[in-house]
Amino acid sequence: MPHKQVVIIGGGFGGLTAAQSLRDADVVLIDRTNHHLFQPLLYQVATSALSPGDIAWPLRTIFRRYPHVRVVMDEVLSIDRTARVVQLRDSRPIPFDILIMAPGSRHSYFGRDAWEESAPGLKPSTVRPGWRRASRPTSSSSRRCWT
């Protein structure tokens, strides 16, 4: 009996765990980035205790010992559940027998969207710009603010 074709959308904890567990399937893991970010340690990058490379690992390196897993770096445009195909931005459509959705999470402000400005959270989209600004202060007063 041929192996099932499993497509996993998302290279976070859920996607990694599913891909590593499904040894009797042909797995295609799709993510927009080529790395897994260990988000519980983002605060240590934000405080300069760790560098970004210490908490981000290439997905292909993680799955080097898993020959049943193929990693595709692309953006999912649509999912045709009837035809069982995932449409991607830059790659050919990928057929599936089983689809696992593990795209990650977003912050919830429980209907109080104004809170986002004061409490942006420690996601890469909020940490990186602050780190870049801090690494290139333009004046001595802003330099003091970041140190």
Q: What is each stretch, according to the model?
A:
Residues 1-3, 69-147:
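FAD-binding core/adjacent interface of flavoenzyme oxidoreductases
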Residues 1-70:
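Beta1-alpha1 glycine-rich phosphate/pyrophosphate-binding loop at the start
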